[in-house]
Amino acid sequence: MLRTIVVFAPIIAALAWVVFNIQKPAREQFNRDFLGKD
């Protein structure tokens, strides 16, 4: 359990950082590329 937390904590932190930085005009581009694929 502790090892899982140690492994996933940095991953979650990185994902949170990315999501936090996407809250900018880049998010519109992201949505266009991601949601407008089909």
Swiss-Prot record:
What superkingdom heads the lineage?
Answer: Bacteria
Q: Which InterPro entries match?
A: PSII_PsbY
What is an example of a GO molecular function annotated in this UniProt entry?
manganese ion binding
Key words, A-Z: Membrane, Photosynthesis, Photosystem II, Thylakoid, Transmembrane, Transmembrane helix
Q: Which residues cross the membrane?
A: 4-22
**Coiled coil start-end:** none
* SS bond list: none
Q: Can you say where in the cell this protein is located? A: Cellular thylakoid membrane
Give one GO biological process term.
Answer: photosynthesis
Question: Which GO cellular component term is one of those annotated?
Answer: plasma membrane-derived thylakoid membrane
Q: How does it sit in the membrane?
A: Single-pass membrane protein
Pfam families documented for this protein: PsbY
What does it do?
A: Loosely associated component of the core of photosystem II (PSII), it is not always seen in crystals. PSII is a light-driven water plastoquinone oxidoreductase, using light energy to abstract electrons from H(2)O, generating a proton gradient subsequently used for ATP formation.
User: HAMAP family, alphabetically?
Assistant: PSII_PsbY
Q: Quaternary form?
A: PSII is composed of 1 copy each of membrane proteins PsbA, PsbB, PsbC, PsbD, PsbE, PsbF, PsbH, PsbI, PsbJ, PsbK, PsbL, PsbM, PsbT, PsbX, PsbY, Psb30/Ycf12, peripheral proteins PsbO, CyanoQ (PsbQ), PsbU, PsbV and a large number of cofactors. It forms dimeric complexes.
Q: Which protein family is it in?
A: Belongs to the PsbY family.
What is this protein's record name?
Photosystem II reaction center protein Y
Q: What is the organism field in this record?
A: Prochlorococcus marinus (strain MIT 9215)
